[in-house]
UniProtKB/Swiss-Prot annotation:
Keywords: 4Fe-4S, Electron transport, Iron, Iron-sulfur, Metal-binding, Repeat, Transport. [4Fe-4S] cluster 3 binds at residues 67, 70, 75, 109. It comes from Escherichia coli (strain K12). Its cofactor is [4Fe-4S] cluster. The gene is dmsB. One of its GO terms (biological process) is anaerobic respiration. This is Anaerobic dimethyl sulfoxide reductase chain B. The keyword Cytoplasm does not apply. InterPro entries: 4Fe4S_Fe-S-bd, 4Fe4S_Fe_S_CS, DMSO_DmsB, ET_IronSulfur_Cluster-Binding. Binds 4 [4Fe-4S] clusters. [4Fe-4S] cluster 4 binds at residues 79, 99, 102, 105. [4Fe-4S] cluster 2 binds at residues 24, 126, 129, 141. The lineage of its organism: Bacteria, Pseudomonadati, Pseudomonadota, Gammaproteobacteria, Enterobacterales.
């Protein structure tokens, strides 16, 4: 492998506007039921009593997540046709001419990245906009973010600059697939496995 690319996700800046998601859908000409990049809204809170006075303790934050082009992708391990594979540049892609649409990859991926396209009759997924990257550009989701909450580049450089945090609630623990992402947590971020909050928009992700 030459260079492993990855995404930087700044949850402290993300407002959940979904511009990245819509830009991706437009650029990739996706059908309504398919979204390669999705916005997770994690929320929670309760009431706390202080000397007879009750106060709210509510929180919410957003995470913009697509395929994480994992170091150890679960999707490629279960693909019976070999359609799902990891390229030399680290991008995990699906060969749509080879895919048989069994959906095993979707069931295996803890991030739900591979998605079935009803119109095409097979799986589709984020390919990291490798065509744009080859031209020296960044993925369309990164360039469209109005708050600059996303970045992209060689994962080693991103980790050197931003650290190596790759999981907060509601994401799974990073050791399962070793995702090539770096997260700057929101001030309200909870650790993976947290039970004080919940995924507020399950139908959207």
């Amino acid at each position: 492998m030459t260079t492993q690319y990855g995404f930087f996700i700044d949850s402290s800046r993300c407002t959940g506007c979904k511009t990245c998601e819509l830009a991706c859908k437009d650029y990739k000409d996706l059908t309504p039921e398919v979204s390669f990049r999705r916005i997770y809204e994690y929320a929670g809170g309760d009431w706390q009593e202080d000397n007879g006075v009750w106060h709210q303790n509510v929180f919410a934050y957003y995470l913009s997540i697509s395929c994480n082009h994992c170091e150890d992708p679960a999707c490629t391990k279960v693909c019976p046709s070999g359609a799902m594979h990891k390229r030399e540049d680290g991008f995990v892609v699906v060969d749509e001419d080879v895919c048989i649409g069994c959906r095993y990859c979707h069931m295996a991926c803890p991030y739900g990245a591979p998605q079935y396209n009803e119109t095409k009759g097979h799986m589709t997924k984020c390919d990291g906009c490798y065509d744009r990257v080859a031209e020296g550009k960044k993925p369309i989701c990164v360039e469209s973010c109005p708050l600059r909450a996303l970045d992209f580049g060689p994962i080693d450089e991103l980790r050197k600059k931003h650290g190596d945090l790759a999981a907060v609630a509601p994401l799974p623990r990073a050791h399962f697939t070793k995702p090539n992402i770096v997260i700057k947590p929101n001030a309200n971020s909870r650790p993976t496995g947290d039970t004080t909050g919940y995924l507020a928009n399950p139908k959207e992700v």
